[in-house]
């Protein structure tokens, strides 16, 4: 039976979204109207990828699953120690007084994390969990997910800023193996690397040398690949294709050629490539679809760090527009929230058990440095990309997913979660 009126995790960043390598900080809020017996208030930060599905073959079933851990930090801030009741020189119990209690925490995320992802057969998920241990009773748990954005830099590959052309042909065959004429599709894009919010400029052409009229469409597609293993260790792969958007482009009569110039597709809030995950991958493509004949895919890459030279030009144009009093309304509405540095809690340094360094002495300094457990405010984006404007965030195009887990039941916290991804343009 839950015996706390409030047990909530609050992050100092209201977006609850962090780039890999940044510091995550916040506090646990405990509210109780009456004094409560407790042992400890514990904290756990976890990040991992997981895949799972059931493979059916006749009457038999094979459960496939795999996981890839990234970090698991557990520490005890020692908040309840000051409420210890001592009788006859012996510690008896800890009584949490009635009122509102705040337990601050901070942790610097590893730099090599992949982005948060929620899919049909797996996820990459990052969570913070607070545990109230009670004597001779069940623990009370509060759990909250947050977004991590992996550093996937479009600038790292110059080819991603170059145009691309993809061509496919299909020779139709009719009765008695007679040729019915070929259909050729060609698709051209202005560049191959993007971030959410950017527009893909597409030009395409269909050469229909068959006798049949063909309908055409332009599709923006996401393909997710999940890798898992059975209990016996056999690896299985599952591919899932999602159509993000589709634009019908009309018909191409037999014996004719039709061409379209600069059709635009705006990229919604989608996860960037998961380059640092071994069991999950996400790829994207723009496809020209010709009815019952062929599909011409043109791969693109979605990253989390945009092409900086173009972004700076766009930013200067936005500033000039603002100076002329013509700032678009959307720029005002979607501008990133201001970070209140004064609201951040004090940075702490902890050992493996969560004890403060000040309580352990100076001899721990070298060990903590070696283990990279120094809790320091991170400005990784400003260090790596000093000219890059701050992003703002939007929830995933696919909406929220159920994140409740049978093995990690929580009495407090949200059962659903939608990752957020960075935008740099309006």
UniProtKB/Swiss-Prot annotation:
Residues 331-340 have a biased composition (Basic and acidic residues). SUPFAM superfamilies: E set domains. Residues 320-340 are annotated as: Disordered. SMART domains: Arrestin_C. Disruption phenotype: Viable. Shows defects in several behavioral responses, including abnormal avoidance response to the chemoattractant lysine and impaired adaptability induced by prior exposure to high concentration of fructose. Delay in egg-laying upon refeeding after starvation. Slight decrease in brood size. GO terms for molecular function: protein phosphatase 2B binding. Keywords: Behavior, Phosphoprotein. The keyword Nucleotide-binding does not apply. It comes from the Eukaryota. GO terms for cellular component: cytoplasm. One of its GO terms (biological process) is protein transport. Expressed from the comma stage to adulthood in the nervous system, including sensory neurons and interneurons posterior to the nerve ring, dorsal and ventral nerve cords, tail ganglia and, CEP, HSN, ASK, ADL, ASH and ASJ neurons. Phosphorylated. Dephosphorylated by tax-6 in vitro. Residues 320-329 have a biased composition (Polar residues). PANTHER family: ARRESTIN DOMAIN CONTAINING PROTEIN (PTHR11188), ARRESTIN DOMAIN-CONTAINING PROTEIN 1 (PTHR11188:SF176). Involved in several behavioral responses including chemotaxis towards lysine and adaptation to repeated osmotic stress. In addition, plays a role in resuming egg-laying and locomotion after starvation. Belongs to the arrestin family. Interacts with tax-6. This is Arrestin domain-containing protein 17. It comes from Caenorhabditis elegans.
């Amino acid at each position: 039976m839950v015996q706390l009126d409030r047990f909530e995790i609050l992050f100092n960043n209201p977006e609850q979204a962090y780039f890999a390598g940044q510091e995550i900080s916040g506090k646990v809020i405990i509210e109780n109207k009456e004094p409560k017996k407790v042992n400890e208030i514990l904290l756990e930060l976890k990040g991992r990828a997981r895949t799972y599905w059931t493979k059916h073959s006749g009457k038999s079933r094979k459960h496939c699953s795999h996981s890839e851990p990234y970090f698991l930090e557990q520490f005890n801030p020692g908040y309840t120690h000051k409420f210890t009741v001592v009788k006859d020189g012996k510690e008896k119990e800890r009584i949490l007084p009635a009122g509102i209690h705040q337990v601050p925490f901070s942790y610097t995320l590893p730099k090599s994390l992949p982005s948060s992802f929620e899919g049909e057969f797996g996820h990459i998920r990052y969570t913070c969990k607070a545990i109230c241990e009670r004597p001779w009773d069940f623990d009370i748990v509060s759990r909250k997910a947050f977004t991590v954005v992996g550093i996937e830099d479009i600038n790292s590959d110059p080819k991603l800023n170059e145009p691309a052309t993809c061509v496919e042909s299909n020779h139709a065959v009719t009765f008695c193996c007679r040729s019915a004429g070929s259909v050729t599709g060609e698709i051209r894009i202005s560049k191959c690397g993007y971030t959410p919010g950017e527009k893909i400029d597409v030009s395409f052409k269909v050469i229909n040398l068959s006798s049949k009229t063909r309908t055409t469409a332009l599709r923006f597609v996401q393909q997710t690949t999940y890798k898992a293993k059975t209990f016996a260790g056999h690896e299985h792969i599952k591919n899932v294709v999602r159509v993000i958007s589709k634009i019908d482009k009309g018909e191409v009569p037999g014996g004719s050629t039709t061409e379209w110039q600069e059709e635009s597709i705006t990229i919604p809030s989608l996860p960037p490539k998961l380059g640092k995950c071994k069991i999950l991958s996400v790829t994207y493509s723009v496809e020209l679809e010709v009815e019952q004949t062929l599909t011409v895919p043109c791969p693109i890459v979605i990253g989390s760090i945009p092409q900086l030279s173009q972004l700076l030009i766009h930013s200067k144009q936005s500033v000039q527009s603002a100076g002329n009093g013509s700032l678009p309304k959307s720029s005002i509405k979607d501008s990133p929230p201001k970070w209140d540095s004064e609201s951040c809690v004090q940075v702490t340094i902890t050992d493996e058990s969560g004890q403060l360094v000040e309580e352990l002495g100076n001899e721990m300094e070298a060990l903590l440095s070696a283990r990279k457990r120094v809790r320091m405010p991170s400005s990784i984006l400003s260090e790596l990309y000093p000219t890059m404007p701050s992003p703002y965030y939007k929830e995933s195009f696919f909406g929220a997913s159920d994140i409740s887990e049978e093995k990690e039941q929580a009495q407090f916290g949200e059962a659903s979660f939608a990752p957020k991804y960075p935008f740099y343009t309006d």
